[in-house]
Amino acid sequence: MDTMVDFKTLPYRKGVGIVVFNREGQVWIGRRLITSSHTYAEVSKLWQFPQGGIDEGEEPLDAARRELYEETGMRSVNLIKEVQDWFCYDFPQELIGHVLNNQYRGQMQKWFAFQFIGETSEIVINSPENSNKAEFDQWKWINLEVLPSIVVSFKRHVYMKVVHEFRNII
């Protein structure tokens, strides 16, 4: 028998979010893969920055570098800034039970900004050498301020904070 879980009693998953600036001052974004399990109404707004969980015993900066490589192939980056606060978002009701094995109410993220100093050929979102499953099906460079308008609504307030934190660093 299934029991309903009050998601407000669940913890936040600790993770990192990564903003990567190119030489022109634009930021890297990827579009989440659309799968048959997507039931969320905002599938047209699946653009986001790389992000991911922090493994047990892992420092947030190390997690940011690992996640960035796993999701984009990028290693040629220099740290610009780490946000001191953690930013949280809750998953919407329609996603409860469909994400992160129903163990978390949302995510609590430490954000980092990096400068990409490599060549575009380094960016690979579906590398066969990478044992991790691809998370993005497209990517592009855009102006930082545009992103809150093209992300899912439940992450928008976090992305607005990220824009505020990083808007004047390049």
Swiss-Prot record:
The keyword Cell membrane does not apply. PROSITE patterns: NUDIX, NUDIX_BOX. GO terms for molecular function: bis(5'-adenosyl)-pentaphosphatase activity; guanosine-3',5'-bis(diphosphate) 3'-diphosphatase activity. Binds 2 divalent metal ions. Zinc, magnesium or manganese. Pfam families: NUDIX. The keyword Zinc applies. Residues 11-164 form the Nudix hydrolase domain. InterPro entries: Nudix_hydrolase, NUDIX_hydrolase-like_dom_sf, NUDIX_hydrolase_CS, NUDIX_hydrolase_dom, RppH. Its EC number is 3.6.1.-. Its cofactor is Zn(2+); Mg(2+); Mn(2+). GO terms for biological process: nucleoside phosphate metabolic process; ribose phosphate metabolic process. Keywords: Hydrolase, Magnesium, Manganese, Virulence, Zinc. A motif (Nudix box) lies at residues 52-73. Monomer. Belongs to the Nudix hydrolase family. RppH subfamily. HAMAP family: Nudix_RppH. Accelerates the degradation of transcripts by removing pyrophosphate from the 5'-end of triphosphorylated RNA, leading to a more labile monophosphorylated state that can stimulate subsequent ribonuclease cleavage. Catalyzes the hydrolysis of diadenosine tetra-, penta-, or hexa-phosphate with the departure of ATP as leaving group. Preferred substrate is Ap4A. Also acts on diguanosine tetra- and penta-phosphate at a lesser extent. Required with IalB for erythrocytes invasion. PANTHER family: NUDIX HYDROLASE 26, CHLOROPLASTIC, UDP/ADP-SUGAR PYROPHOSPHATASE. This is RNA pyrophosphohydrolase. It comes from Bartonella bacilliformis (strain ATCC 35685 / KC583 / Herrer 020/F12,63). The lineage of its organism: Bacteria, Pseudomonadati, Pseudomonadota, Alphaproteobacteria, Hyphomicrobiales.
